[in-house]
UniProtKB/Swiss-Prot annotation:
Cofactor binding remark: Binds 1 FAD per subunit.
Disulphide bridges, residue numbers: C135-C138
Name the record gives this protein: Thioredoxin reductase
GO process terms (BP): removal of superoxide radicals
Names of the cofactor(s): FAD
Subunit text: Homodimer.
Single GO MF descriptor: thioredoxin-disulfide reductase (NADPH) activity
UniProt cross-references to Gene3D superfamilies, sorted A to Z: FAD/NAD(P)-binding domain
EC id: 1.8.1.9
Catalysed reaction equations from the record: [thioredoxin]-dithiol + NADP(+) = [thioredoxin]-disulfide + NADPH + H(+)
Length: 310
């Protein structure tokens, strides 16, 4: 089936739903394709305490459900589908979905987000949300006065480790090399922090824990040279080996930087293709917060309205 629309939004995280709310209120009748993970990364977060407007802790899935309902109530058509292919070579742009539908859109807002890179071991998946996390700001509070392991050696890992010392008694950074890639200033801060210790030349072999209640109790680490395995006791494991923006669909059709983020013009959500806009973590390598994603979704919607009214 071929469907035409003025605005098509790809992705249903805070950026996509914010863009939907604003374009709908501009009477543009947007269509939003919610993707493989409706609601985005927040659906993987149980307790949300840093989104403005809520005095008490809220649940990530609940917040995204509320945003989705709000978008629908103001006139957004939300489609349960995923995008397989796009053609951005000319307007109207063409979008092909997994269910076989074809959309033609005068403008597109890309809000496909970015996913945390994971270790790829079975135990990591088993305890995700039960002691395994990739967001210290989101989940660090729940490990107050406990021991935590951070995995990684770049800026993200060191920033996470330093932040977690606000909550944890002890933070152990496990890194597969014998030096960090992170900026020198971050390394200096980390080495001076009495709560942080570093284990070099090790990888995570297994995350161990209990089932009743389901919780992490430690990690087995493996020396990359000797293969010797040791146990480090901890209550939480934070994976900080980087983020991977979901931009594979758009490669070769739109400007993407060396880190695979969509390039937008300074102070704008406009891309190098007229009529195509990008918002949220798919183009934001610095902040990566729900509130900043929602804000950029609003920006994209306002810019789309201006573009279509030329």
């Amino acid at each position: 089936m071929k469907i035409t629309t003025k605005v098509l939004i790809i992705g249903s995280g805070p950026a996509g739903l914010s863009a939907a709310i604003y374009t709908a209120r501009s009477a543009l009748k947007p269509i939003l394709i919610n993707g493989m993970q409706p609601g985005g990364q927040l659906t993987m977060t149980t307790d949300v305490e840093n989104y403005p407007g809520f005095a008490e802790t809220i649940q990530g899935p609940w917040l995204m459900e509320q945003m989705s309902m709000q978008a629908k109530n103001v006139g957004t058509e939300i489609i349960s589908d995923y995008v397989e292919r796009v053609d951005l070579s000319k307007r109207p742009f063409k979008i092909f979905t997994g269910t076989g539908n074809e959309y033609e859109a005068d403008s597109i807002i890309i809000c496909t987000g970015a996913e945390s890179k994971w270790l790829g071991i079975a135990s990591e998946q088993e305890f995700r949300g039960f002691g395994v996390s990739s967001c210290a700001i989101c989940d660090g509070f729940f490990f107050k006065n406990q021991e935590i392991v951070v995995v990684g050696g770049g800026n993200s890992a060191l920033e996470e480790a330093l932040y977690l010392t606000n909550h944890a008694n002890k933070v152990t950074v496990v890194h597969r090399r014998n030096s960090f890639r992170a900026e020198k200033i971050l390394q200096d801060r980390l080495f001076k922090n009495p709560k942080i210790s570093v284990i070099w030349d090790h990888i995570i072999d297994e995350i161990v824990g209990s089932n009743k209640p389901k919780a992490v109790t430690g990690v087995k680490i493996q020396n990359v040279y000797t293969n010797e395995i040791n146990l480090v006791n901890c209550s939480g494991v934070f994976i900080a080996i980087g983020h991977a923006p979901n931009t594979a669909l758009f490669k070769g059709q739109i400007a993407i930087d060396d880190d695979n983020y969509i390039v937008t013009q300074s102070g704008s959500t406009r891309t190098n293709v007229e009529g195509v806009f990008a918002a949220g973590d798919v183009q934001d390598k610095i902040y990566r917060q729900a509130v900043t994603a929602a804000a950029s979704g609003c920006m994209a919607a306002l810019e789309v309205a201006k573009f279509l009214n030329k």
